[in-house]
Protein backbone atom coordinates (compact mmCIF):
# COMPACT_ATOMS: atom_id res chain seq x y z
CA UNK A 1 0.00 0.00 0.00
CA UNK A 2 1.57 3.27 -1.14
CA UNK A 3 0.50 6.89 -1.22
CA UNK A 4 1.50 8.84 -4.33
CA UNK A 5 1.61 12.63 -4.63
CA UNK A 6 1.32 13.83 -8.22
CA UNK A 7 2.17 17.41 -9.19
CA UNK A 8 1.34 19.49 -12.27
CA UNK A 9 3.77 22.42 -11.92
CA UNK A 10 3.06 26.02 -12.84
CA UNK A 11 4.50 29.35 -11.74
CA UNK A 12 1.01 30.76 -11.04
CA UNK A 13 -1.05 27.60 -10.39
CA UNK A 14 0.45 24.28 -9.32
CA UNK A 15 -1.95 21.35 -9.20
CA UNK A 16 -1.57 18.46 -6.79
CA UNK A 17 -3.30 15.11 -6.45
CA UNK A 18 -2.90 12.36 -3.88
CA UNK A 19 -3.94 8.75 -4.38
CA UNK A 20 -3.47 5.59 -2.36
CA UNK A 21 -2.62 2.33 -4.10
CA UNK A 22 -4.11 -0.85 -2.69
CA UNK A 23 -3.17 -3.71 -4.99
CA UNK A 24 -4.90 -3.01 -8.29
CA UNK A 25 -7.06 -0.23 -6.86
CA UNK A 26 -6.44 3.50 -6.74
CA UNK A 27 -8.19 5.45 -3.99
CA UNK A 28 -8.59 9.22 -4.14
CA UNK A 29 -7.27 11.00 -1.04
CA UNK A 30 -7.23 14.64 -2.09
CA UNK A 31 -6.40 17.22 -4.72
CA UNK A 32 -6.33 20.94 -5.30
CA UNK A 33 -4.24 23.85 -6.47
CA UNK A 34 -1.56 26.02 -4.98
CA UNK A 35 -2.33 29.50 -6.29
CA UNK A 36 0.56 31.88 -5.92
CA UNK A 37 -0.16 35.51 -5.15
CA UNK A 38 3.24 37.18 -5.22
CA UNK A 39 4.28 39.24 -8.22
CA UNK A 40 7.93 38.39 -7.57
CA UNK A 41 9.03 35.01 -8.95
CA UNK A 42 11.03 34.29 -5.80
CA UNK A 43 7.87 34.76 -3.71
CA UNK A 44 5.89 32.43 -5.98
CA UNK A 45 8.60 29.76 -5.77
CA UNK A 46 8.56 29.97 -1.97
CA UNK A 47 4.75 29.59 -1.98
CA UNK A 48 5.07 26.48 -4.18
CA UNK A 49 7.77 25.01 -1.93
CA UNK A 50 5.78 25.77 1.23
CA UNK A 51 2.55 24.46 -0.31
CA UNK A 52 4.08 21.15 -1.41
CA UNK A 53 5.81 20.83 1.97
CA UNK A 54 2.44 21.23 3.72
CA UNK A 55 0.75 18.68 1.42
CA UNK A 56 3.57 16.22 2.16
CA UNK A 57 3.12 16.83 5.89
CA UNK A 58 -0.64 16.36 5.64
CA UNK A 59 -0.78 13.22 3.44
CA UNK A 60 2.59 11.58 4.23
CA UNK A 61 3.12 10.23 0.69
CA UNK A 62 5.59 7.44 -0.03
CA UNK A 63 6.34 8.56 -3.58
CA UNK A 64 6.34 11.80 -5.58
CA UNK A 65 5.69 12.18 -9.31
CA UNK A 66 5.80 15.34 -11.40
CA UNK A 67 5.16 16.29 -15.00
CA UNK A 68 8.30 16.79 -17.06
CA UNK A 69 8.05 19.96 -19.09
CA UNK A 70 9.70 20.08 -22.48
CA UNK A 71 7.88 22.93 -24.17
CA UNK A 72 6.42 26.30 -23.28
CA UNK A 73 5.03 29.37 -25.03
CA UNK A 74 8.41 31.13 -24.93
CA UNK A 75 11.83 30.91 -23.31
CA UNK A 76 10.82 33.05 -20.32
CA UNK A 77 7.79 30.84 -19.62
CA UNK A 78 9.93 27.71 -19.93
CA UNK A 79 12.43 29.07 -17.40
CA UNK A 80 9.71 30.01 -14.90
CA UNK A 81 8.04 26.62 -15.31
CA UNK A 82 11.37 24.88 -14.77
CA UNK A 83 11.91 26.88 -11.60
CA UNK A 84 8.41 25.99 -10.34
CA UNK A 85 9.20 22.32 -10.97
CA UNK A 86 12.45 22.78 -9.07
CA UNK A 87 10.67 24.24 -6.04
CA UNK A 88 8.30 21.25 -5.93
CA UNK A 89 11.09 18.72 -6.46
CA UNK A 90 13.20 20.28 -3.70
CA UNK A 91 10.24 20.02 -1.30
CA UNK A 92 9.95 16.31 -2.14
CA UNK A 93 13.69 15.78 -1.82
CA UNK A 94 13.81 17.52 1.57
CA UNK A 95 11.13 15.03 2.69
CA UNK A 96 13.27 12.13 1.36
CA UNK A 97 10.67 11.10 -1.22
CA UNK A 98 11.70 9.31 -4.39
CA UNK A 99 10.96 11.55 -7.39
CA UNK A 100 9.61 10.27 -10.72
CA UNK A 101 9.08 12.40 -13.82
CA UNK A 102 6.73 11.77 -16.74
CA UNK A 103 6.10 13.58 -20.00
CA UNK A 104 2.66 14.96 -20.82
CA UNK A 105 2.32 12.29 -23.53
CA UNK A 106 3.05 9.48 -21.05
CA UNK A 107 0.51 10.88 -18.59
CA UNK A 108 -2.23 11.31 -21.19
CA UNK A 109 -1.61 7.80 -22.54
CA UNK A 110 -1.82 6.28 -19.05
CA UNK A 111 -5.06 8.10 -18.20
CA UNK A 112 -6.95 8.35 -21.50
CA UNK A 113 -5.18 5.90 -23.79
CA UNK A 114 -3.85 8.49 -26.23
CA UNK A 115 -1.01 10.96 -25.87
CA UNK A 116 -3.06 13.63 -27.67
CA UNK A 117 -5.90 13.79 -25.14
CA UNK A 118 -7.49 17.13 -24.30
CA UNK A 119 -7.85 18.53 -20.77
CA UNK A 120 -11.59 17.73 -20.70
CA UNK A 121 -10.86 14.08 -21.53
CA UNK A 122 -8.34 13.87 -18.71
CA UNK A 123 -10.80 15.42 -16.26
CA UNK A 124 -13.52 12.96 -17.33
CA UNK A 125 -11.28 9.89 -17.10
CA UNK A 126 -9.87 10.92 -13.72
CA UNK A 127 -13.43 11.31 -12.46
CA UNK A 128 -14.27 7.81 -13.73
CA UNK A 129 -11.05 6.09 -12.62
CA UNK A 130 -11.14 7.51 -9.10
CA UNK A 131 -14.94 7.37 -8.79
CA UNK A 132 -15.27 11.08 -8.01
CA UNK A 133 -18.72 12.73 -7.79
CA UNK A 134 -17.61 15.51 -10.16
CA UNK A 135 -14.70 16.24 -12.47
CA UNK A 136 -11.83 17.94 -10.63
CA UNK A 137 -10.58 21.34 -11.82
CA UNK A 138 -8.11 21.09 -14.71
CA UNK A 139 -4.82 21.56 -12.83
CA UNK A 140 -5.85 19.15 -10.06
CA UNK A 141 -7.02 16.60 -12.67
CA UNK A 142 -3.65 16.86 -14.43
CA UNK A 143 -1.86 16.28 -11.12
CA UNK A 144 -4.06 13.27 -10.36
CA UNK A 145 -3.18 12.09 -13.87
CA UNK A 146 0.51 12.28 -12.96
CA UNK A 147 -0.17 10.14 -9.86
CA UNK A 148 -2.23 7.62 -11.88
CA UNK A 149 0.54 7.44 -14.52
CA UNK A 150 3.08 6.74 -11.78
CA UNK A 151 0.81 4.06 -10.31
CA UNK A 152 0.54 2.30 -13.70
CA UNK A 153 4.29 2.55 -14.32
CA UNK A 154 4.95 1.25 -10.83
CA UNK A 155 2.59 -1.70 -11.34
CA UNK A 156 4.27 -2.54 -14.66
CA UNK A 157 7.71 -2.49 -13.06
CA UNK A 158 6.51 -4.71 -10.21
CA UNK A 159 5.08 -7.17 -12.73
CA UNK A 160 8.26 -7.16 -14.82
CA UNK A 161 10.44 -7.70 -11.78
CA UNK A 162 8.59 -10.93 -11.03
CA UNK A 163 7.41 -9.74 -7.64
CA UNK A 164 3.78 -9.71 -8.70
CA UNK A 165 1.55 -12.56 -7.69
CA UNK A 166 -1.86 -13.50 -9.02
CA UNK A 167 -3.37 -12.82 -5.60
CA UNK A 168 -2.00 -9.31 -5.11
CA UNK A 169 -1.57 -7.85 -8.58
CA UNK A 170 -3.64 -9.92 -10.97
CA UNK A 171 -2.25 -12.40 -13.45
CA UNK A 172 1.08 -11.49 -15.03
CA UNK A 173 2.82 -14.02 -17.23
From Swiss-Prot:
Cofactor note: Binds 2 Mg(2+) ion per subunit.
UniProt-annotated binding residues for Mg(2+) 1: 8, 139
Cofactor(s) it depends on: Mg(2+)
Compartments where located: Cytoplasm
This protein's UniProt keywords: Cytoplasm, DNA damage, DNA recombination, DNA repair, DNA-binding, Endonuclease, Hydrolase, Magnesium, Metal-binding, Nuclease
InterPro entries per UniProt: RNaseH-like_sf, RNaseH_sf, X-over_junc_endoDNase_Mg_BS, X-over_junc_endoDNase_RuvC
Positions of the catalytic residues: 8, 67, 139
EC class name: hydrolase
GO BP, one annotated term: DNA recombination
Listed PROSITE patterns: RUVC
CDD domains on file: RuvC
Coiled-coil segments on the chain, per record: none
Catalytic activity as recorded in UniProt: Endonucleolytic cleavage at a junction such as a reciprocal single-stranded crossover between two homologous DNA duplexes (Holliday junction)
HAMAP family listed in its UniProt record: RuvC (MF_00034)
Biological role: The RuvA-RuvB-RuvC complex processes Holliday junction (HJ) DNA during genetic recombination and DNA repair. Endonuclease that resolves HJ intermediates. Cleaves cruciform DNA by making single-stranded nicks across the HJ at symmetrical positions within the homologous arms, yielding a 5'-phosphate and a 3'-hydroxyl group; requires a central core of homology in the junction. The consensus cleavage sequence is 5'-(A/T)TT(C/G)-3'. Cleavage occurs on the 3'-side of the TT dinucleotide at the point of strand exchange.
Protein name in the entry: Crossover junction endodeoxyribonuclease RuvC
